[in-house]
Amino acid sequence: MKHIVKHIHFVGIGGAGMSGIAEVLVNLGYQVSGSDLSRNAVTERLAALGARIAIGHDAANIEGANAVVVSTAVRSDNPEVLAARHRRIPIVPRAVMLAELMRLKQGIAIAGTHGKTTTTSLVASVLAAGGLDPTFVIGGRLISAGANARLGTGDFIVAEADESDASFLNLFPVIEVITNIDADHMDTYGHDFARLKQAFIEFTHRLPFYGIAVLCVDDPNVKEILPFVSKPIIRYGFAPDAQVRAVNVEAREGKMHFTAMREDAPPIDIVLNLPGLHNVQNALAAIAIATELEVKDADIQRALADFNGVGRRFQRYGEVTVTSGGAYTLVDDYGHHPVEMAATIAAARGAFPDKRLVLAFQPHRFTRTRDCFEDFVKVLSTVDALVLTEVYSAGEAPIVAADGRSLTRAIRVAGKVEPVFVDTVDEVPDALGAIVRDGDVVITMGAGSIGSVPGRLAGNEGVK
């Protein structure tokens, strides 16, 4: 590719999916430029690596580019897209560029409605501990690496495979993981769940004859597609028919202790430095792949015991002082679908038993709020205190009765928790300050702008 394409421009370079690919391309020696609406830590990092970053979108930003990379979040009337089309510069979907990177190495693609980022991070960490030095592209910041991407010298590239826009069908990896299949982003599939499941089946058909599908058989929808997967399968989970199976599972001091039973290898005792049964499942996928690639057991154990987590995936900010005296424990999480939220809340209950759980949640997308409304009411009613913001639109138009106030009213009617509604995330710190107590566990949660709140809470109040 490099002898033809030397300069690659990214529209929306600061996004989680785009920035990782851009960083790998910079490190491969390409000239990389990009634009975004505002500066953030990601754009600053890319600029320090040598990328040319423009704030704001303008046709002049693509000057000299041989290709322009876009995500599905970029509108077709974006001035840089219009300029590229006018100049006949190839406009490349993000997933197609990721597929191009995968052609350079052997791809390990992690798919599923929930758990992709954590599972991708665990796989990359275990392979790195085993000396395989993988390249990785992750949808969140791997805390141990300080970045969401890294160019390794090894044979493998580990990356998330995104089903939200069906773009994972552009990838042709040699190993695939499917963590679960759930009803999300249903507009992509015409609100037809059968079409969504068929897309995951088609994803497995992208594997070569020597490829492997690593599938979580705890998920009923994954189990349903098993008969239609024609490539070799490794089943993982808690289920009795799993080939890589967790037994003797215990939650202790925010960590998960378990034994991984393996069909073709001895059992291995694991201490996972993450809470929650869902993270045990994610770790089993990493153990399955590492075992297949002959990573030593001691390296697997060390990687999982030392795993420092991923930014905004049950990210702990430590103890934050309370104005009235004492302190609370602050955790931040990206969860924005009821299934993910329930798993995170369960993990928090396991990690902090007998603590009062306070949640500040920003719903993400009006369509998701509408489609999962009753499930949101149920899961949000399981916490002890709740602050709820208006929906983060992600570019969507408002939908009647699918806004934050409607959700607040429904939760209040359910009668299990009294929600506090605020219009914006800027009001969240004060709202929390009015209800938080010494000894509480506070979780900020959502995929939108609420991600800025924990840093403000910790910075303003001081982290111990």
From Swiss-Prot:
The protein's Enzyme Commission number: 6.3.2.8
Give the catalysed reaction(s), semicolon-separated.
UDP-N-acetyl-alpha-D-muramate + L-alanine + ATP = UDP-N-acetyl-alpha-D-muramoyl-L-alanine + ADP + phosphate + H(+)
Give the pathway.
Cell wall biogenesis; peptidoglycan biosynthesis
Entry's localization field: Cytoplasm
A GO cellular component annotation here is: cytoplasm
What Gene3D superfamilies does the record point to? Mur ligase, C-terminal domain, Mur-like, catalytic domain, NAD(P)-binding Rossmann-like Domain
Say yes or no: keyword Acyltransferase present.
no
Q: State the InterPro entries in the record.
A: Mur-like_cat_sf, Mur_ligase_C, Mur_ligase_C_dom_sf, Mur_ligase_cen, Mur_ligase_N, MurCDEF_pg_biosynth, UDP-N-AcMur_Ala_ligase_MurC
The record's GO molecular-function terms, alphabetically, read: ATP binding; UDP-N-acetylmuramate-L-alanine ligase activity
Q: Which controlled-vocabulary keywords does the entry list?
A: ATP-binding, Cell cycle, Cell division, Cell shape, Cell wall biogenesis/degradation, Cytoplasm, Ligase, Nucleotide-binding, Peptidoglycan synthesis
What Pfam families does the record tag this protein with?
Mur_ligase, Mur_ligase_C, Mur_ligase_M
**Record-level GO BP terms:** cell division; cell wall organization; peptidoglycan biosynthetic process; regulation of cell shape
Q: Which sites bind ATP? A: G112, T113, H114, G115, K116, T117, T118
| NCBIfam families noted in UniProt | murC
Which family does the similarity line name? Belongs to the MurCDEF family.
Q: What is the role of the protein in this entry?
A: Cell wall formation.
Can you name this protein?
UDP-N-acetylmuramate--L-alanine ligase
User: What's the name of its gene?
Assistant: murC
